Amino acid sequence: DLSQEDDRTRDRYGRNTWGQQLLMARRLIEAGVDVLTTSLRGPLCGRVQNWDDHAVTHHVFDALKFRARAYDQAVSALIEDIHERGLNERVLVVVTGEFGRTPKISYQPSTGEGNASAPAGTRQPGRDHWPRAYSNIWAGGGLETGRFIGATDARGEDSIERICGPGDFLATIYHHLGIDSANVRACERERYASQRLSENE
């Protein structure tokens, strides 16, 4: 019940769907929920209500401007709030998508008008799917924070330093949950081989 939160806290997260979603997430964590997933989608994303920023969907730069304030406010409020409440050892916050976006901007005719999209037929910039390099945000969970891990080449096309894959991503979460990733199996057939990120790296 978000009405139990004071106005200052609700304003801090943002009086919009994303802000109130992440405030609810914090409340559920305080109530004892161990694993929680929330998705920042819907009207705050733009015309098609997701982050699929192909040129036919969104004007990628307008879409980022359209989302940035609500995203930054909600995510930073959650991370700060977790630290201020002393939950930063117990709670691991991971903000990610499923892949990156092409470093090279593509141009295609827009398929429709609306938030973060040009009128139908107007050529607009976009970015397509790109699995070779992307980033995520990690906070809390007892991790050493305030740093970057890894790097891409100058064009942002490929990871060139401290390359981590999905196995590393999952193994780090498993480690936080007290699960030995060496014993995790996918589909009960193949061993899910990965190493967690070292606590000191």
Locate each region found by the language model.
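Ligand-binding pockets and gating/stacking loops
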Residues: 1-201
